[in-house]
């Protein structure tokens, strides 16, 4: 394991490794211990008590964070006719049909989110092996396969984030930047927490929020006290 830098160790020393902080304290500490020389992302990791091997315990979706993420998302929309015009009017960065399928097959990836109307999924499906591993494949569960392309694009531009539980049951998400006011980051955190609470599978047993941590892009993690989380 690579040795951590002196700056990292100094930042980590400000955190009590045995303590679980309330959300406000955790966010404030994460900001304070950021060691990056740029406006780093503030990230959260929820370790959930789910068994992702079971189909009814798969957690995936999307949520619009009230204060956005601070990141500009480049949106590619696969649509035609009136729906293509709607997507362009809503602010999509790229709108098209087969020409973008070819571009992607040739290695073009200058976008962050892909939206498609259902009638375009036959074409988009050709990109499954390319988009799937990158987490870019449109999916009805995240609202990216839809006829309402206007709403989809506007929500993404407003700060919509997708979340998905990994095999280990961990959900990672960005809740903003270190330049955000603490209360705005806390509001984003609680919005995501509420969504995950509502997504709890009925068959999930035992403790649901096993552990939660807040961190910045390069900073140390801060453990969050989950005892006040309501289920």
Curated annotation (Swiss-Prot):
Signal peptide: none annotated. PANTHER family: 54S RIBOSOMAL PROTEIN L1, MITOCHONDRIAL, LARGE RIBOSOMAL SUBUNIT PROTEIN UL1M. GO terms for biological process: regulation of translation; translation. InterPro entries: Ribosom_uL1_bac-type (IPR005878), Ribosomal_uL1 (IPR002143), Ribosomal_uL1-like (IPR023674), Ribosomal_uL1/biogenesis (IPR028364), Ribosomal_uL1_3-a/b-sand (IPR016095), Ribosomal_uL1_CS (IPR023673). One of its GO terms (cellular component) is large ribosomal subunit. Belongs to the universal ribosomal protein uL1 family. The keyword Chaperone does not apply. The keyword Secreted does not apply. It comes from the Bacteria. Keywords: Repressor, Ribonucleoprotein, Ribosomal protein, RNA-binding, rRNA-binding, Translation regulation, tRNA-binding. Binds directly to 23S rRNA. The L1 stalk is quite mobile in the ribosome, and is involved in E site tRNA release. Gene3D superfamilies: 3.30.190.20, 3.40.50.790. This is Large ribosomal subunit protein uL1. Part of the 50S ribosomal subunit.
